[in-house]
């Protein structure tokens, strides 16, 4: 784990939370969801490549061991949240809901292009559904992306980006969310791009040491400019993550060797994950602001589910 990302993970987790926080039915930070999720998918590819490059490619660990470790990362909190939401709504459960429950439980709901499925139960678990697909593909795409011809990969990435952007402009607007924001195949591009960012970082590792504060400030300003200009981006591209690859990649690349996380508690990188995944069960109720009853948010709220679900399981990894 590159510690310099802990702070940024926390910042983008808060951005996603603010995206779900509404005042008078309007999101406080509309860009927080799209850009925040893109950041986490790209960072996921980067960090997995960083942590598993040698171990997988030298067969220090097997593919099955990798899958076991990832399953432990995904499922404990997911099952806890799923059970909580399921039990709260069990009185309204009907037989017709069974397929949704099964797909959600096994993190397959994102493959069905219908909000009734991918937003069922703990709605934000669609993110985990995508991550599950990424993890399954990771051992196979890693050697190809790290050892393949740089020119061929660059040409392929360019062709994909152009095709992806064109598709975003042509697809009916009512399909944007399902096919570009949620679908695992579409978001897999973010994950792959994160691995490619790691490839560049790894090849220029010595050159990345000692980045100037000017470069860091430039990366931060570029990301904030993206947030500010988000509303001016044509709506077809709001869910087209290719638009945000540049700013996010620059941020990750430049801060790969900094120590932004040194002022954060050791468990913060775990807490951001719990915060993101636990927004769903209560977001409609707790994330709407009313003048007579302001919703409150305490930074220690996610600590309990982390200590009760993920932390005990990590002992066995």
Protein language model regions, located:
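Interfacial loop-to-helix transition and helix-capping segments at the boundaries
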Residues: 2-3, 26-37, 116-130, 170-193, ...
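Generic alpha-helical transmembrane segments of integral inner-membrane proteins
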Residues: 14, 43, 79-87, 136-140, ...
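Membrane-interface junctions at the ends of membrane-embedded or membrane-associated helices
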Residues: 53-60, 144-152, 199-214, 256-271, ...
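Alpha-helical transmembrane segments of multi-pass integral membrane proteins
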Residues: 191, 218-317
């Amino acid at each position: 784990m590159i510690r310099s990302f802990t702070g940024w993970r926390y910042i983008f987790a808060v951005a996603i939370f603010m995206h779900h926080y509404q005042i008078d039915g309007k999101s406080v930070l509309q860009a927080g969801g799209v850009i925040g999720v893109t950041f986490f998918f790209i960072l996921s590819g980067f960090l997995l490549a960083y942590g598993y490059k040698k171990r997988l490619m030298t067969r220090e660990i097997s593919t099955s061991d990798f899958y076991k470790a990832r399953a432990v990362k995904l499922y404990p909190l997911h099952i806890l949240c799923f059970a909580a939401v399921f039990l709260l709504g069990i009185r309204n459960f009907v037989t017709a809901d069974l397929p949704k429950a099964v797909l959600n439980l096994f993190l397959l709901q994102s493959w069905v292009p219908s909000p009734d499925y991918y937003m069922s139960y703990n709605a934000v678990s669609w993110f985990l559904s995508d991550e599950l697909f990424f993890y399954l593909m990771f051992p196979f795409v890693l050697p190809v992306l790290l050892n393949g011809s740089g020119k061929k990969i660059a040409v392929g990435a360019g062709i994909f980006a152009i095709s992806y952007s064109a598709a975003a402009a042509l697809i009916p607007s009512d399909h944007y969310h399902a096919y570009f924001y949620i679908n695992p195949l579409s978001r897999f591009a973010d994950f792959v791009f994160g691995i490619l960012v790691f490839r560049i970082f790894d090849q220029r590792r010595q050159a990345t040491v000692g980045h100037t504060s000017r470069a860091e400030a430039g990366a931060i300003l570029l990301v904030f400019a993206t947030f500010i200009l988000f509303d001016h981006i044509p709506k077809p591209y709001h869910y087209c993550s290719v638009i945000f690859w540049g700013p996010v990649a620059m941020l990750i690349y430049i801060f790969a060797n900094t120590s932004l996380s040194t002022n954060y508690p050791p468990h913060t990188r775990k807490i951001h994950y719990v915060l993101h995944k636990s927004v769903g069960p209560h977001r409609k109720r707790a994330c709407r602001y009313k003048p007579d009853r302001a919703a409150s948010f305490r930074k220690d709220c996610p600590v309990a589910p982390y200590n009760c679900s993920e932390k005990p399981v990590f002992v066995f990894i």
